[in-house]
């Protein structure tokens, strides 16, 4: 038996699902991503959401202005789908290289999604246009009906929304984002080449027991919510199999500490500083490090039809302690795995 490798050299990764927020928060969090990743799909759920080419161009510039000198980072912008969105605006943004993809949030599914889509039928002209021009649809795959249990919302979405949509628009490219269930893992694996998925580090590392047993851990609270162990294991097995239509999407979602540690706390894990090492740990635990680079750096570009990055980064296998918090202007930000000792980290 050989000793585990102490250095992992991989092609520079991309993050295919990222929240950067805006204003002072954006300026704080951007460097944690731009330091490591070549590109990131940036979520459009600002207040107000990014629904026009003009808004996306302006937001992209604010992101670029926050990238430190020496970082080579390209934000890939997305359009927030609404019931009233003009298909021509979406197509113009795609053709001009402003929009890389469009995001479907069911109304009120997650942070700043009150403008989201009330039904797929309401945006069918937009989706038909996307199918025609080859624009990927990114989906937060949960139903939001009040009578459906929060732990069942992803599985119900597959049968009631996702499958009918893909049957109707057979050429539409779809990314099932941040999948959290065995149902979704099986669905994506059994799908065709036009269906892919992203998985977060927290859904690979933890299940709902970690969040709820022995005290509520608000910094593990995200949406879709952590599920039971059987679902966590299915996700781990999917990435460890080398399946090539699943790729890195951190869903890093920063909230100030007082908005997380609250009587009605916000959903989201700020994992940008620790995500890549977390993924490496999971792949190592699953004896699947041979598939780690593809998950981080190859599968995503392949699905999107983009070139892979031509630079490389290294991760080192040495214990490091994660910072307890990161300073904001008037609060602090608690990173994923705050205060814990991690096994893998990006070589500085």
Swiss-Prot record:
The modification N6-carboxylysine is found at residue 103. Substrate binds at residues 19-21, 45, 140, 223, 255, 267. Zn(2+) 1 binds at residues 17, 19, 103, 251. GO terms for cellular component: cytosol. Zn(2+) 2 binds at residues 103, 140, 178. Pfam families: Amidohydro_1. GO terms for molecular function: dihydroorotase activity; zinc ion binding. The active site is at 251. Its EC number is 3.5.2.3. InterPro entries: Amidohydro-rel (IPR006680), DHOdimr (IPR004721), Dihydroorotase_CS (IPR002195), Metal_Hydrolase (IPR032466). PANTHER family: DIHYDROOROTASE. Belongs to the metallo-dependent hydrolases superfamily. DHOase family. Class II DHOase subfamily. This is Dihydroorotase.
